[in-house]
């Protein structure tokens, strides 16, 4: 098991061009941008759609929030996004989310037509306009409308969309008792093809693995990388505890470097819990004392089984509970 101690550096956001003039959305656009399936079997369920949806500087009701059917975000999943949480009306680590958004855009050659400062103000305004005290924010940047071909240089007017809404996470009993995982046959994207560090609108890789989990009766599934090492779950990062040592796969394993993941590593350091990034296998999870997942929507939740094998005592462990409690305090500071 290769390992290295945890270090994390936050880069500065890359600023785009000055903020656009927020043109009116063409009323002939035929696609309702923000329709959602009933996710009752998914990791979380949207309770009610946002009544004030932000698109390029303007607000629309959910029924009137539309983008072009020629938008490459729809046609090819060409765009980037961030999923964030609000606690007490304040977005948790918004700056870090925007840094990651800009890095995803830079990696895919997508120019965000605003600045990080302006977008910070827009996200906060959207949260306030929707009176969202506790909930979820989805921030999306599409490539914009173009031709039916792949050529991204024929696209113009990237769409910036922000939804602020309430969500229901996993059922309370899963937070109390932990959830079960299976290992998906679908492996994580090879970093040489598409970096998992890019939070792309194309989530088919994750969706296929998610379907495997759901068909097996599990709400989450573990994804391995092309080397057979543990990467992450379909929507969350994964941690294990062995003999008091906290371990999580490194970025090089092909993971999305989660904002919640990094917050938990920082908390562990503050609490005197030794934490490392280490290349892990399923054997390491099978033989771990504890296991838990982290994510903006999931927060911190224990995993008590993998592939029908109990992890540890088959219930949330002491370190998992300590970090969960510390995280819930952190997000409301």
Predicted regions: what is each one?
Residues 2-4, 13, 19, 37, ...:
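Basic polycationic patches enriched in arginine
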Residues 46-222, 226-229, 252, 256, ...:
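Conserved alpha/beta cores of soluble small-molecule-handling proteins
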């Amino acid at each position: 098991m290769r390992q290295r101690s945890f270090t994390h550096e936050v880069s500065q956001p890359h600023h785009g061009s000055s903020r656009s003039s927020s043109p009116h959305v063409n009323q002939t656009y035929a696609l309702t941008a923000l329709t959602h399936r009933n996710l009752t079997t998914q990791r979380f369920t949207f309770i009610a759609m946002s009544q004030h949806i932000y698109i390029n500087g303007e607000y629309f009701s959910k029924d009137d929030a539309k983008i072009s059917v020629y938008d490459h975000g729809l046609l090819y999943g060409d765009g980037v996004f961030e999923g964030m949480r609000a606690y007490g009306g304040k977005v948790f680590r918004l700056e870090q989310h925007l840094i990651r958004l800009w890095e995803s855009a830079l990696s895919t050659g997508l120019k965000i037509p605003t600045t990080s400062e302006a977008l910070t103000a827009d996200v906060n305004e959207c949260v306030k306009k929707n009176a969202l005290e506790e909930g979820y924010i989805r921030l999306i940047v599409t490539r914009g409308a173009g031709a039916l071909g792949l050529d991204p240089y024929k696209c113009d007017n990237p769409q910036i969309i922000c939804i602020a809404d309430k969500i229901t996470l996993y059922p309370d009993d899963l937070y109390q008792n932990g959830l079960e995982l299976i290992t998906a046959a679908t492996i994580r994207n090879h970093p040489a093809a598409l970096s998992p560090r890019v939070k792309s609108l194309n989530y088919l890789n994750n969706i296929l693995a998610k379907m495997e989990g759901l068909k097996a009766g599990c709400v989450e599934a573990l994804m391995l990388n092309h080397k057979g090492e543990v990467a992450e779950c379909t929507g969350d990062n994964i941690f294990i505890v062995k003999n008091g040592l906290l371990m999580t796969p490194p970025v090089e394993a092909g993971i999305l470097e989660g904002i919640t993941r990094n917050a938990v590593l920082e908390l562990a350091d503050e609490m005197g819990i030794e934490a490392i990034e280490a290349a892990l296998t399923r054997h390491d999870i099978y033989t771990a004392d504890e296991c838990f997942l982290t994510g903006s929507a999931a927060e911190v939740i224990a995993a008590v089984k993998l592939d029908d094998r109990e992890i540890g005592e088959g219930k949330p462990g002491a370190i998992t509970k300590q970090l969960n409690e510390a995280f819930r305090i952190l997000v409301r500071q």
